[in-house]
């Protein structure tokens, strides 16, 4: 699984969300997204997404490819991964191309969210909700992996 935290996204959503966490399954390219108010909520969001992903896929999360941002190197997160048997693969600093799968999906999701808002004439404060909608739509679209 590949993960990345995107943000801060301005303007803030009506729910006070500034960031979104995107996790992408390596085999199927299925995505899970969580809107977050702070970076401190990253570990809890990953726990929720992991439970949902394991229930959906019927397999345990074993490897997580992420960047070197502090939210992924914090003690709480490293302890959680160690206790749950998750191996973390970090990309080199300032090398987003090493985590290209999730970085590219971020671009696709943000672009689609922007297009959804523009097409309906909605204000930018609904970008978070548009991101969730974009992930929902992309998960139901065919990919090369399928």
Language-model-derived ranges and their functions:
Residues 1-146:
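Anionic group-binding determinants
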